[in-house]
């Protein structure tokens, strides 16, 4: 007992200092949690708070259990043999184990659950048997003291025989009680067990002693057990309501827990959870011949699983260790949450510090249901639910074991992870993903860098590609923007460099190709950031910067080279780089590089790399071009897809707003959005052209401090702009698609598509600049009816990302744009003619302004047919897509040979006819033109016409308007002051365009007939022409008389002649001077 008193204070009861005045066999106990002193009789297992005055009287009557029917007489013989055991031994096994259930400390359930039966049994046996006082204090795994007893072999054998007999169904109460006591001796840590058995344990011994607590039970036992027996649930003494699969090895018969016993225990666990008392009865072998099959499987050894002798015979495993194993196993198994909850409930419900005799029976067993439900209770009493508790339906107490539906396949954690993150793989022997950084086995220094960067776990693309890449296998990874692809290949590169140990001065070991300078420098920054601890060197090669510094860095040596294909190919041709050490090749944004036309350079570079390399290809889309180059460059690759590959998907973390905005309202709406953002929020505005970027920078930048980046900026300017934007000094970045891919800047809140891009893929990449690395973002897109052909794909992207689709966009998609989509005429490549509108109308007549759809002169974005203003120019040019007054190459319109009809930067004439169609343009100045479609060849072009914006004068703003064209000076079509057409002899495009764009502008000059003049020169234009036109065999010269006195009918006739004339002029450059003179004279007469 001294050993027990020296035990540290814990939540469980402990012996009080020995008091010689206490009558025997009473002992003083102290509740470890409350410190309350109470008294316990080991023989009767009675506890009370009043100090006992005399030993309690012993009942001389034996329990009358003859009324309990027994299934066989053979078991009774074994029970009679068990009667010969000393009663002291029975008490020794059950004395102190039963007492904790009556203490106030019994309400502290965790200590009871964690305390092994072997801890408490010696405490009682130490009082009664001197040979068992050799106890060893063993620190319990859960922090509670545990007592390990080493018993003599004789007593172990005796206990073993008792256990063997206690397995069999009992006829007599003392046998029943002995079996119960002995079994409970190994489950003292189960509190509810104690609550029940404290009243039933001293039911009787070999001498037929019966104590008051047993008398309480006898009044109920015959009726209850009889009822249960007739139901096939004979439970005269019951195994604990515990699935055997949840027991520790110490509770098994041979302690080894072999496969057969595990299977049997699993069946028993299922039966106990689903069948309740029937399963318990089966375990106790108290069955009729037709009882549970589980009893037949377990045989007579089931109760012996708790045999103390068998437990201690396995000296290499201590009892407390076995109990710890069980507890851990119990808590770790599924389906035990209901038991845990019940274990938490029991102490609370039994926490009243009442005298055991004064406590109601239902309170003493803690209400009944948890007693039976708790699998850790050990033996729960004679009845399944406790001797003093009402009968409960078992399903209300124990949660049935979870059984998956046969329809649903069992998924492993890896499959669940892949399904949750939409990870699909194609290949053989694909390893499981690294769900956490710790499971990846990465070097500590790399893990520190990743954790310090704030990454909680690998992204799906990283988790799946890392283990594959570390196997030196080729990979094709397809994932959307912002998915963490950069670290997906950098981390394997770091691991490779740790093993290779190559001399970087002989050439790089890792080569990474990227499409743009911005992405290349960004990859370099990430490599230096996460490879700092690994002492990795990295250099970046890109165009737009001097080669000298880059070559010097290569000479110093670099483990990793990040390059754009163009600059790397240049350096390779200079033979300033050696690829013989390259072991890892990475193609980042491979689809973008192919779109930019880098495939020849890529193939040339790859041919210089040894074939033993490992190749990783990361792409956002999977078109056939990418598939082809992947099949050529990769060997047996593993394909890893994040999301669906067959459709373009946007990041669902981005809220997308698509607004149908007229061109003239875009700038005003842009300013509204910028003003609505929080101060300091980073915004990217994407435009389709450099010119528009500069224009917006001038108009918007004054108020919002915007910076611009596009292809015309030098590398120094680009770096400065990006640094300004990253640092927050400039919160608005205006960019072309050069920044649509690979640009990774934190805290970008808003992306605005001022122009819709040339494809939905670019749209997805544009908006992907926000919502990166798990953040959220907002994207605004200005959509016009001219973008109608992208509407169906845009709707798919919006619906795929669960975004709202505006009704206007649906209408545009249904009608094909422009108010009658099928009416759009197309050019030779199937593209929509820019100046044709559907439904037979013309683009020049279709909208506000001077016929323009969005104001201006029917340009896509205002101006005179221009996309962004100007006279037909896409951005502020006179018909030019890129130049100010013309096409990309500063020409007017998109005429026959791609728009060099009326070239020159400052011309007063322009191609108002546009790409084609019979477009009309008119204002009340002097314009009337009719385009005759695209025409054929240079002479006729894509819409002919000329615009003279001056009232009554044929003066061109530039005297050398058409000097780049025809150099022949045989005649002058017009005596304009500028002489702009004096050198055009061929009449190819100059004349044809002039014919196409003039039919209206003479109406404002006194209501005369329509004049087809191109100029309103104050002097007669053709009177000085004495030279007759050259006559050829195929020229048809129109009669001069029909056009001299021109009226409306004659004008119509002339229009019918013009196509033939034009086609002829295209062939030989004939000039119909008479027709031109007739066209000019009515205008000349009007001059003052």
UniProtKB/Swiss-Prot annotation:
Gene: RH40
Domain Helicase C-terminal: 669-813
Protein's name according to its UniProt entry: DEAD-box ATP-dependent RNA helicase 40
Keywords on record: Acetylation, ATP-binding, Helicase, Hydrolase, Nonsense-mediated mRNA decay, Nucleotide-binding, Nucleus, Ribosome biogenesis, RNA-binding, rRNA processing
Keyword match Transmembrane helix: no
Lineage: superkingdom: Eukaryota
EC nos: 3.6.4.13
One GO BP: rRNA processing
Family to which the UniProt record says this protein belongs: Belongs to the DEAD box helicase family. DDX5/DBP2 subfamily.
Keyword rRNA processing found: yes
Biased composition (Basic residues): 984-1013
């Amino acid at each position: 007992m001294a050993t027990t008193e020296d035990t540290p204070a814990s939540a469980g009861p402990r012996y009080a200092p020995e008091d010689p005045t206490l009558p025997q066999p009473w002992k003083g106990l102290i509740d470890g949690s409350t410190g309350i002193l109470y008294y316990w009789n080991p023989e009767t297992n009675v506890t009370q708070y009043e100090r006992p005055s005399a030993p309690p009287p012993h009942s001389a009557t034996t329990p009358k259990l003859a009324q309990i029917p027994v299934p066989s007489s053979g078991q009774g013989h074994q029970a009679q043999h068990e009667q010969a055991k000393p009663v002291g031994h029975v008490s020794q096994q059950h004395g102190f184990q039963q007492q904790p259930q009556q203490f106030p400390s019994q309400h502290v359930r965790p200590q009871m659950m964690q305390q092994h039966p072997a801890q408490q049994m010696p405490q009682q046996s130490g009082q009664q048997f001197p040979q068992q006082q050799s106890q060893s204090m063993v620190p319990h795994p859960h922090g509670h003291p545990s007592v390990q007893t080493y018993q003599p072999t004789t007593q172990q054998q005796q206990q073993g025989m008792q256990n063997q007999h206690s397995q069999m169904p009992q006829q007599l109460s003392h046998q029943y009680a002995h079996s119960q006591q002995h079994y409970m001796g190994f489950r003292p840590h189960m509190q509810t067990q104690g609550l029940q058995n404290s009243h039933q344990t001293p039911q009787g011994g070999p001498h037929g002693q019966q104590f008051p607590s047993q008398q309480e039970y006898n009044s109920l036992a015959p009726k209850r057990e009889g009822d249960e027996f007739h139901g096939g649930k004979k439970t005269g003494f019951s195994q604990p309501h515990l699935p055997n699969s949840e027991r520790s090895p110490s509770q098994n018969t041979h302690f080894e827990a072999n496969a057969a016993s595990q299977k049997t225990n699993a069946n028993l666990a299922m039966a106990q959870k689903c069948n309740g008392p029937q399963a318990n009865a089966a375990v106790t072998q108290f069955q009729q011949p037709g009882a549970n099959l589980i009893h037949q499987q377990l045989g007579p050894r089931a109760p012996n699983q708790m045999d103390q002798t068998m437990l201690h015979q396995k000296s290499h495993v201590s009892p407390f260790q076995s109990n710890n194993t069980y507890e851990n196993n119990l808590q770790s198994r599924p389906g035990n949450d209901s038991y845990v909850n019940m274990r938490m409930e029991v102490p609370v419900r039994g926490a009243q510090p009442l005298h055991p005799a004064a406590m109601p029976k239902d309170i003493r067993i803690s209400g009944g249901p948890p007693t039976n439900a708790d699998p850790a209770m050990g033996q729960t009493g004679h009845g399944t639910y406790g001797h003093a508790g009402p009968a409960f339906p078992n399903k209300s107490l124990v949660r049935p074991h979870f059984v998956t539906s046969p329809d649903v396949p069992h998924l492993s954690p890896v499959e669940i992870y892949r399904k949750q993150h939409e990870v699909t793989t194609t290949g053989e022997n694909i390893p499981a993903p690294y769900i956490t950084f710790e499971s990846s086995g990465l070097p500590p220094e790399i893990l520190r860098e990743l954790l310090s960067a704030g990454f909680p776990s690998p992204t799906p693309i990283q988790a799946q590609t890392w283990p594959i890449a570390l196997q030196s296998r080729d990979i094709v990874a397809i994932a959307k923007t912002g998915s963490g692809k950069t670290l997906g290949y950098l981390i394997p590169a770091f691991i490779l460099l740790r093993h290779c140990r190559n001399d970087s001065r002989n050439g790089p070991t890792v080569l990474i190709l990227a499409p743009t300078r911005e992405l290349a420098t960004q990859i370099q920054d990430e490599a230096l950031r996460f490879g700092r601890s690994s002492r990795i060197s990295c250099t970046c090669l890109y165009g737009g910067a001097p080669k000298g510094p880059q070559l010097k860095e290569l000479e110093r040596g670099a483990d990793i080279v990040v390059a754009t294909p163009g600059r790397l190919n240049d350096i390779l041709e200079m033979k300033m780089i050696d690829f013989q050490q390259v072991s890892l090749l990475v193609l980042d944004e491979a689809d973008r590089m192919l779109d930019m036309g880098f495939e020849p350079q890529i193939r040339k570079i790859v041919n210089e790399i040894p074939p033993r390399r490992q190749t990783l290809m990361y792409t956002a889309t999977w078109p056939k071009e990418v598939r082809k180059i992947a099949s050529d460059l990769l060997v047996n690759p593993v394909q890893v897809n994040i999301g669906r590959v067959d459709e373009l998907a946007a990041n669902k973390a981005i809220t997308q707003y698509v607004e149908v905005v007229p061109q003239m309202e875009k700038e005003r709406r842009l300013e509204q959005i910028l003003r609505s953002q929080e101060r300091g929020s980073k915004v990217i505005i994407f435009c389709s052209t450099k010119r528009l970027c500069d224009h917006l920078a001038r108009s918007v930048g004054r108020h919002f401090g915007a910076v611009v980046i596009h292809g015309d900026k030098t590398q120094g300017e680009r770096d400065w702009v990006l640094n300004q934007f990253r640092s927050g000094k400039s919160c608005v970045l205006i960019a072309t698609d050069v920044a649509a891919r690979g640009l990774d800047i934190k805290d970008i809140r808003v992306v605005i598509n001022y122009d819709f891009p040339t494809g939905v893929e670019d749209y997805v990449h544009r908006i992907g600049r926000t919502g990166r690395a798990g953040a959220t973002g907002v994207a605004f897109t200005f959509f016009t009816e001219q973008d109608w052909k992208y509407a169906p794909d845009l709707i798919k992207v919006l619906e795929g990302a669960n975004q709202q689709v505006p009704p206007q966009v649906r209408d545009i998609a249904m009608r094909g744009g422009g108010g009658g989509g099928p009416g759009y005429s197309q050019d030779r490549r199937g593209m929509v003619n820019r100046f044709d509108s559907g439904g037979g109308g013309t683009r020049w007549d279709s909208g506000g302004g001077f016929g323009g759809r969005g104001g201006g002169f029917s340009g896509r974005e205002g101006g005179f047919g221009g996309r962004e203003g100007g006279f037909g120019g896409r951005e502020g040019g006179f018909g030019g897509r890129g130049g100010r007054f013309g096409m990309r190459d500063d020409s007017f319109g998109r005429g026959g040979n791609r728009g060099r009809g009326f070239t020159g930067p400052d011309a007063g004439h322009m191609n108002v006819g546009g790409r084609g169609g019979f477009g009309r343009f008119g204002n009340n100045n002097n314009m009337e033109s009719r385009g005759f479609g695209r025409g054929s060849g240079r002479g006729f072009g894509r819409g002919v016409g000329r615009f003279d914006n001056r009232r009554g004068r044929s003066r061109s703003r530039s005297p050398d308007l058409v000097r780049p064209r025809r150099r022949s000076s045989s005649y002058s079509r017009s005596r304009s002051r500028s002489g702009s057409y004096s050198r055009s002899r061929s009449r190819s495009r100059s004349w044809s365009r002039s014919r196409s764009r003039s039919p209206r502008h003479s109406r404002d000059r006194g209501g005369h007939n329509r004049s087809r003049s191109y100029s309103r020169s104050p002097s007669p234009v053709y009177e000085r022409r004495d030279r007759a036109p050259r006559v050829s065999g195929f020229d048809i010269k129109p009669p001069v008389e029909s056009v001299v006195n021109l009226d409306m009918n004659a004008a119509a006739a002339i229009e019918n002649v013009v196509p033939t004339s034009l086609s002829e002029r295209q062939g030989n450059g004939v000039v119909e001077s008479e027709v031109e003179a007739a066209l000019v004279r009515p205008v000349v007469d009007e001059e003052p």
